[in-house]
Amino acid sequence: MKSNTKNSVKRKSPPPVNPNKKFPSFEGKQTSIKDFFFNDTTTPPKTPTQPIRFTQNNNKENDKSNNNNNNNNTITPIKKTTTTTTVVVESFDDSRNTNLIQQFQKASTPSSPQIPNKLPQQENQQQIPNTQQQQIKQLQQQQQQQQQESPNNLFKTIKTTTTTETFEEFLLSQPTTPPPSNTTTTTTTTSSSSPSSSNNITTIDDKNNLIKNNRYYLNDFLIVTETVYKRDKHLFINDEKDYIEGMIETLDRDSQHLFVRLYNRKGPWFQINELKSSNYQNEIKNIGAAIESLVEYGFLEYYSSDKHDYNEIANLLKIDQLKSIASSFSIPNSSGKETFLKVISGEPFKGQSTLFSPKPIYKKKVENLVGESIKIVTEVVELWRMIHHLYFYSWSTHDSKSMIVNNIMGIKYPEYTVWKSKVKKEVQQKEEEVEKEKEEILQNQLIQVKQESDVIDLTQNSSGSSNNNNNNNNNNNNNNNNNNNIKEYDIDLTENESIFPNRESLLKYENARKLEEKSINLYESGGDLVALESILQVCLDELGRSVSKKVKYSFALKFTVGWVYTRILSWSIDIFEKLRKYQQCIDFLMLLIESPYCRGKRGYWWQRMIINHKHLHRSDDALLIAERSLKEDPFLRSGDRLAIEKHLIQLSSPPRRWRIPAGLIQFSYKLKEPISTTIYREKVSNNQQGYKSKYLFLTPQIKINKIKKIIIKSSQSQNNQQKVQSSLSSQIQTQIQTQIQTQIQSSQIQIQSPIQSQSQSQNQTPIQSQINNNNNNILAISSQKSFDSILTTTSINNTQSSSQNIYIDEETSLEITSDDELFPPGQSYKIEKENQLQITNSVKKEEEQEEEEEEEEEGQGQEEEEEEEEIIEITHGTVEEVSLEHYSQNGGWEGIHCETSIFITLYVLYFWDIIFDSNVPHVFQSPFQNSPLDFGSDEFYFTRKEAIDNRIKRLEHSNYDDLLILLNQSWLHNGCEARGVNWKSTSLEQLSIISKCLGGKLIAFISRLLTEDFKSFSHGMPDLLLWKLNNNNDDDIDDKNNNNSSIKFVEVKGTGDRLRDQQRIWIDMLISFGCDVEVCLVKNKKN
């Protein structure tokens, strides 16, 4: 462990506890998880011997040796201590906890200070229990209460016995700090016997109160640490284990709080003065003592002028402080913080007027302004990042923010059991031993047969024995090498307790992810291409070592270095293609094709290799590559195969080749084509890049939004309400109209009624009609809202004259739709606010006159909330929305624009219990997973083959009622984070109708495609799903055959758009099943 005062190496054991060190939060004793169980608050010690008294002089010498003068308590890592101003008594039970104390002493540092036992004299002998059995019963009762009320009850508790226990069996939980001791100066002796007679003993209630006071982020942090430490303890070295055990067992609560706070902040450096004046003091009693504790145990380190660079802490300064340091340079005040940091870094730059470096001057100024600062030790940060990676199995998550969000927002995850290393039963062990014996017998028999055959070969073919032996030796060597390669890179999850079998594999993966993050930052920031090429060269070297290796579990390959290097090289191909370095891309692609990683990208790699050869005018080579990919690659997806077949047909045109080899073309000439429909609509040009084209509807679409309003009800009679309402409305409404007219004229906007706007839109350009339609909607809302707001203002300014139900809109009530194009940002809201101010000032005098007259009649008002509906007309939409309007008016179809999302949702819901089956090993490594680790891989189907096949058969023979049963069971998990499920987009009623229209057979057919090849069929489905319920009696129609409803799949294409390869595959699959599929072409009416 690192220390700031001495130049010492890292300790291989927990650091010693300073006997002269005082911590105000400890309140007289070292608090750790061991003390939580060892210090019995209900059991007195055994017969004490002789008390040792200290004089006042000795107490003064003790005070001088302490670093903090808050109390006079000495600290020992084991013994209980109770102290007053004149006497210090330390005692512990020798007979009850002898074995446990010896084990804890072995785990501590040999250099830790040993304080002799100071046992009290005969004053405490009367408090000894009568029998030892009562003492053991009291201990058991106390530990049961603690176990029930502990928030981090993750592991098994320590049993109260006298037998020897291992260190790993201790309960790893958060320590608690005892309350302050109430010492007096008049007493001369104290006893550590019963709680009633001792003021320093911490009761169970006090400990439970301290546990409840712990923040949720600290609990989450400890849960993550404890879970990973127990499950993956083999991945940590001794120094890292010391850090983890010190965090869980040795540090007090305040130190833990401070460390977690600093770890979750952006650092790395923090000013101590800022920490002491922050809000942390509300939850941490003594921040200074917590910092000293963390520094002593090696978690934090102080800034040192000799050890660290002052530029690391310069970022803590504010912009005004940086300007004062760099005041000697003529730098514009408008410059950013980075400019001033670059200036005070001391590096020479253009415009520097001195030959000598001002670095020492800047260094002194920065250090004086920053003051004392601390940071978390780099090794500690990397350790806990690794712990969080192993807990969440997400290398983009470095802290417990997802757990914090889960606690705050109430986000739920599916119910499953996280995989743990299970102890094999005796029956399983015997069966495995029998199988091993059988395998050994078979291997021995095979060896004997081979030896006999070799003898026969030697006698018959003596002349060619040398050559045959050499060949056999070579073959055996090759087989041995292959076996070694498989063992080296194969991840056998049936034997290992973790996906990472050893520490070396974990560290390699961590370094590879850091390299990937660095390369992405270089690419996004437009960094040096030379640095990026150096990273790619490392990837090439490392990936070349694992090209010929084989693996069993493809989902576990995600956590290997080869997978990461493959991804880096894959996305870098696009960069070099833009730079027209086609040969370099081909070299990368040839290596990627030979690797076993990222099989879903193989089709993309083959296509890019063919295209790059075309760029280099190597058509013959491109043709050979296309043929090789179709012949030899069994991992080609259907859409990728269709694209390569198109390249093959193009390259095989005469005179290069007159005939394509048989068996290579599987899709190009066999795909079924859908029916084509063309509709014409007037296009609205928005002249904005990156936005879809919009087309006018035949009839405006009506959209209803709900607005929350507060109603202030007066206690006056209805007659008075009607009188005041008529007087106010007649005066205010005329002013509203005049004010809106002036505002609109100044903004060059014309007021039109909806009828006038529709009649005039025919004589306007599309963009003018779009503006007018938007403004009509805005003005209609604005005028109504202005009237309500004026009534609100008059009632607030003149509360005693209010006599009607006044509607108060929320400030954000204008933003009532997700369609931003309907409301130009801030325009209508600004008009409304100006109207409110002007009209309020104009009627203020009348309100003051009415205030005096109605002051005596005004009663107390009551507030209520109501929801009102607001109707908005939408005049234009996307090609999909226009198509939905067309099929609604022509055939009465109902439908949604969903593409593949609705079918993935149905697939997950109908297979929920199979997907989240905890019996599949190693697929659930964290409680924060929205899907198993193998979801979407080849192993997902093979490991659950029987269950999936049975569910598909059940769906094929299901009627509507059977589908509803499965759907309702899965809907009980509504709100859980599940991959592919959006609970808010569709309701249970909508899913039920869609399931009824689709039928069990079609749902089973689509589910089989998603199960067997999720990566290919999880995209590319037609845009629209249409359904229509026929007006027939359900009694006369068999729901099982789905004759009472009709469905239609529609792929929508705009001008210049065409079907993609995977879309053509989906269309062919649906038509082959018997579905009605169409392609709707939306074209501009003018053209």
Swiss-Prot record:
Q: Which cofactor does it need?
A: Mn(2+); Mg(2+)
InterPro entries assigned: Fan1-like, FAN1-like_euk, FAN1-like_TPR, FAN1-like_WH, tRNA_endonuc-like_dom_sf, VRR_NUC
Give residue spans, biased composition: Low complexity. 41-79, 118-154, 182-202, 467-485
> What Gene Ontology terms describe where this protein resides (cellular component)?
nucleus
Tell me one GO biological process term.
interstrand cross-link repair
Which PANTHER family does this one have? FANCONI-ASSOCIATED NUCLEASE 1
Q: What is this protein called?
A: Fanconi-associated nuclease 1 homolog
Task: Record the organism.
Answer: Dictyostelium discoideum
